[in-house]
């Protein structure tokens, strides 16, 4: 197994009976959680971890990034859970949400799961087709980002994909290091439908969250994910795909924190 970067923020005050493990989405790494979410949940008493999947952030495997599969990322999550060795709530964003779903469906264990702007259980084929109609230029630019990294596209592309117009232009430069190239293979993996793996485990507590202005997923797709898990989705208005770094990130974090209190 490759060596994986894990960022950990220790709890402040009395610690909680379970910890949190955050899994990033495509084109990103663990550092995206450390802007707001890791320190915030640490103040609430949670040990908060974030892992960079292989080829991302400071994890090993960057040279082989184009060939990493969804199965590789699921194996990374399983290895991280085993390494941490503590009761965990898994919180996955976008591709990370799909990694969490596949991990649980293939025998992985967790206290609960939160899916944020997650790839639906049935894959990304319909959202990809929708993006081709809504914003074909963005799809082309994301292809360049996937292959060559942020240096080949301007920061405005990352903003269109991940952030709302409410993020000041002066803030964009500090977010640019949070993004990187992505595996072409895993994007193909997420387009496919596996009827034997998509059905979720109904006994696991799951919270499903989405954003009204998501460039990748329309609210109906987030709601379909929630129905698959026998729950309802919360869609945050005036919010883009990068929910953890949006101006109203605290609304998302507080919604998760309130739900964690019910476990």
Give the positions of each predicted feature.
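Conserved acidic catalytic loop of the alpha/beta-hydrolase fold
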Residues: 72-88
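Conserved alpha/beta-hydrolase "acid-adjacent" motif
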Residues: 215-224
